[in-house]
Structures are given as C-alpha cells and as structure tokens.
Amino acid sequence: MSEQTKSVAKSISVLSIAGIICKLIGVLFSIPLNMISPQVATVFYIVYPTYTLLLTISSAGLPVAVSRLVAGFLAKSDKNNAWNTFRSAMIMLASIGGLFSLIMIVTNSLLVNMVGVEEASAGFYAIAPCVMIVCILSAFRGLMQGQQNMVPTAISQVIEQGGKVIISLPLAYLGLKRSVMAGAAGALLGITLSEIAALIYMFFCYRSKKPAFDSLPQNPENKPLSKKVLLRDLVVISVPITISACIVPFSQFIDSAMMIKRMLLAGLTSDQAKAAYGIFTSIVIRLINIPTALALAISMSLVPAIAACKARNDQAAVRKETDTGMRYAFLIGFPCSVGMSVLAGEIVRFFYGGVSKFSADQIQLASELLTFSAMTVVLFTAVQATSSILQGLQKQRIPMYTMIAGVSVKILLNYILIGTPGIHIHGGPYASIACYSVVMILNLAFVCKYAEMKMNWIDWIIRPGLAAAVMGAVVFLMHTLLPSNRLVTILEILIGIGVYLAAAFACKAITVDDLRSMIRRRAK
C-alpha cells in the first residue's frame, strides 16, 4: 500500500471516529434539552434550521475548494499560491459570513414573523454571529485538509459538539428560570460559544503548523497567480458544490410542505399525519445521520488526495486512490446499513424508549421506518465518495446534476407513495432509496469514465456485501434468542463488529495493510 493510500486511510479513520462521536452527541443532546423544557427545545429547533440553511449557502463549497486547490498547488511544490489561495478564501468567507450574520440580525423581526414564534427573537440574535465564526473556521479547515492533515478538523468537530452539551444545556437551564425565550437563547448562545472554542483551537493549530508550511519547497518555475484568478477558481469550484449541498435541504423543505397533505389524502387524520411525519424526521432521520458521518469522513479525505494526483498528472495514482476510496465507502457503508436494519427496533428503543412523549405505537412505527431507511446509508456513503472523487477530478458540476436528478425522483415518488392508502409515511424510505440509487449509479458511471478505470465489482461490492450478510445473519440470530434491553443491544453491536471484521478478513474484503493504515492516527 502506497504512502498516499495510507494517508487517505488514516484520514478516513480519524474523521470517522470524530464524526461518529459528534453524531452521537447530536442525537443525545436533544434528549436532555427536551427534559429541561419541551418548549425551549421547540424554539431551539425552530431557529436552528434557518441558521443551518444560511451556513450551507455561505460556506458549504468553499472549504472543499480550498482543500482541492491547496492540495493541487502543494503537489506541484507551489506553496506560495497555496498560501495565497488560503488568504483569498479567508477574506471571502469572512466577508460572506459577516454579511449573513448581519442579515440575521437586521431581519430578526422578519424571521420571527416567518416562523410564527415570538420566543425565537432572542435565539436568532444569539446564533447570528455563529455564521461568520464557522465561515472563518472552515477556511482554516480547508487549509489543513489541503495538506491532508485531518486531525485538527476532527478535534475541532468534537469541540463543537461537546460544547453543545457542556455549554448549551447549562445556559438553557439558567435561561429558563427567566423565560422560555431566554432558555432557547441560552441554548443557541451555547452553539456560538462552542464554535468560538473550536475556532480558537484551529487558530492555535494553524500557528503551530505555519513554520512547517513555510519550510515546504517552492519551485521557482511556478509563477504567482493574481488574487482575481484565485478568487475566480474558488468561485468556479465552490458554487456547484454549494448548490449540491442546498439541493437536499430544499427537497426536505418540499417534503415538509407536501408529506402531511399527502398523508391526509391517504386516509390518515391530521393528528396521525403530523405524528407520523414527526417520527420520521425527529427519530428516523436523526438516527440515519449517525453513520453518515463516516461518509463525510471519506469525502473530506478523498478530495485533496485525488486533486494532488490530478495536479501531478499521475493517472495511475488517480485510479489507485479512486479504488481505495470506493472500497472503503462500501466497506463502511454495507455493515452500517445491514446492522441498522437488523437492529432497527433495538436502536430506536435504545435512544428513545424511555422518552415519555413517544408512545409504544410510535416507537414501533419508527422501528419499521428505520428498517428500510437504513439501506440509504450504504447508498449515501457511495454517493459522497463518488461526488468527492469527481470534485477532485475537477468535475464538480456532475454531482450537482446527478443530485438534481435523484432528488427529482425522490419528490415524485414521495408524492405518489405517501398519498397511497396503506403506504403513506412508509413511502419516505422507499423514495430516499430510489433517490440515492439513481445518484450513485450515475456518479459511478462518470467516475469510471473520468478516472479511466473499470468498475471493481468484486472488491467494492461483492466482498464487503458478503461480509455484511454474514454479520447480519449472526446479529439477527442473537436478536431472536436474547432479551431486548440496552446492554444486550450494545453487546449485539460489538459482536456484530467483530463478526464483520472476521468475515471481511476471510473473504479478503479487508487486508492486514488496511487495518494497520486505518488504526494509525498519527498527525503529520
């Protein structure tokens, strides 16, 4: 295994561990927040989507663009243009972030009228500075990722999410003593303070790594590019990625406006439709998001690695990194999908079984939905990997078009299936599976075309799929023989991981080299 491939494997392992920790904290955060006050939690989750939408628009594509350009310049021994790219991106991100933060402050009353909750006013003020802070933070992350050093990004993500528990929950509790508005504002202010803590950490990482960056070689034949050219390149790369990142939230907005109405036509009462939609969004989607952290880890690692190979015109290395990325995508995605599907009921009860606001019937519905929704994990992981490979190959528009095609299928199927009696909310998982299947198939075709390689069916799909099937059979047998409780669920998951690794070794889906590379987490 080459040093470049080992670096990608190490990056994936570091970001995967951090991502899973962050997702688990995110799921667990909502439970104590609801215990402090359901009203505070309601206001929090009314304000938060507006923040995430503005954040996606302002900063989704630029960190990827920075990492790709920096990796490309460094591969050609051009540290000066790599540094100028970072500086240009920092100015752009700080300006855009500052503008969006100002918009949140100036349009506070308009936003409150839009959400229809007066208690949200202070919350919008509390989280407004966060947009600019995260934009600046993402510039530092892009620089580090461009050098293929994922440790600072991983640790800063844990700081962000840890702050939600350590800072947001106490502030929500203290604020609630005054009012619901103050409680929600306290929780949202905690998010801002958490991002400040993460930014401080990244700044110190940047300062400590700067001497090493300055000592990198500079090829005198590389001419400095103007700020205009660098800004143009950043925009050309980031805009399609940003649009792609906004497509899924846009489809979720359409779903929120359509799904309840379609369920009413399917024969459900208004209360039943609202409850079913709430179960799907607040339990199932939230649980599905936990393993998707692994997909994001793969995507962040692949973009700079592929871009560096592309910059050196090393097509053999491009094929090697593409093969490695896709193999890890399915190697991680298959067991997550199979495991979540087989243990859907146990997983739902593990997190939400003791939450009083959910009835036994609602927990059962969530379990049924998660059984099918779990299949989207392997598809989403493959979509993220293929999209990142295409972005690294300077084909960033293709994932945007394929995602539009997939989401169009999803919206159409949601409209048809959810409005069908006897299916209603169960159509949501089917539509999502169809969506990501379309995107994955299209992306794979383009990856094989532009990476100039053939689909590796055996290593990508057959071997990890077979290992996941063995794991699923063993876990299902345990599930039928053992009692259902949290301790047994943890035991089943741990044994499932062990069985999967053993089966993967047996069918050569994983090699000793793979395991060594993924365990090594030493920072560069």
Protein language model regions, located:
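Membrane-proximal transmembrane or re-entrant/amphipathic helices at the cytosolic face
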Residues: F476-K524
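Signature of the first transmembrane helix
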Residues: S7-V64, S101, I105, C130-V131, ...
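Specific pore-lining/lateral-gate transmembrane helices of multi-pass inner-membrane transport
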Residues: G72-A89, A276-A374
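N-terminal membrane topogenesis motif
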Residues: M1-V27, N80, N84, E221-V248, ...
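Alpha-helical transmembrane segments of multi-pass membrane proteins
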Residues: V117-F140, F358-T386
